[in-house]
């Protein structure tokens, strides 16, 4: 959300299901692109762009290469569908036609060959041991990301840089509190990000959803606290060793902070959680009487395992996977998930997963096996993490049944990560059966998991869509919160 659940969805599925097919494509590309016998090094200066196919989506990558007066090469890297930020390439080299880029902090290496025309670089993009074919083409005009909803200063409200402590876990949390100017005792919300380490703006795919949401709500007279996740920005701690329970404790600390702020009405503090954040919000509301309301944005209503089955099939189907691939994926997921649930010893789980990998790759080529082995090492860390094991078996209905405050649950009809029908149905049924009389669930047409207006809902579209948050979703949240805090303007 949002890394959402995608990273975990493809954790071993890419290896066990898609990797052999990917390797075949790579082999065909290599056969069609023989290594040129370059007499001298071509000109590498300029902008090079190309799509990286990682199975569940395609990410557009860009390298901008410059040359100093002394001939030294330098480069900047951008993942166009993930962030607008440029990152410095640590190592840039060109020897005859061989190109080498390294981004050490991201564990990224690209090795390629420039064609004789100097218009294309064909090679391998490696990230943390996983290798994918990548073809970069020289472009005259770099691709720019247009994000028209991102607010620009000056703002008609106040913004405070804040920090506070989660005393239970010894974590310092840092964020931004936006406050309606010239008002006191205003309602407030805490924004809760989706899975993975994200900054206070929930920045992903070149979008900053929580920045846009905070700006909109604060203009409506609602204070908004958005916070860096553990280990991100100004916050301490670590995400890999944490579970949703730990993140819920972080939110509880945020509530205590807001209760003491002189500009906030302590009886009108609510939570807005996106994706996994929509799982955490009910956890907190079930424990604390200080939560006045919650908004679940694509929040789960089913156990993690069930969501991953649905999610995996929908995303692969949207990307053109055959029924055979879908069946193989489900079977592989089922084996992995059953093992994770039944075996508590991590060492035993790892051993069994390696054996399963060897079995699945038995008929693959030697080169495919080598590539798959690299991917296995990188992805094992994810499925063996405390977070994944917790998420797999956690049933959000247990906490939902204890939530007594008003609830607004929104899902996009094109959401392929937290499918709308199954999850909204369970959320509504659980809350109402438990006696909650103020429950609103809404299906929003054409909106995806990020609440963007979309064509298919595939994660492949996220970064390509200019809209960050659909105005219909923003207005629905703002109106509902104002109604429930009696603060209509």
Annotated model-derived regions:
Residues 416-424:
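Conserved alpha/beta-hydrolase "acid-adjacent" motif
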Residues 34-128, 149, 156, 162, ...:
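Central antiparallel beta-sheet cores of small beta-barrel/beta-sandwich binding domains
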Residues 53, 142-184:
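N-terminal cap/lid segment of alpha/beta-hydrolase-fold proteins
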Residues 253-323:
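Primarily recognizes the serine-hydrolase "nucleophile elbow" in alpha/beta-hydrolase
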Residues 184-186, 195-225, 304, 416-417:
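Short substrate-entry loop that stabilizes the transition state in hydrolases
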Residues 295-402:
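Accessory cap/linker subdomain of secreted extracellular hydrolases
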Residues 209, 241-262:
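Alpha/beta-hydrolase active-site loop
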Residues 403, 409-411:
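Short beta-strand/loop motif that positions the catalytic acidic residue
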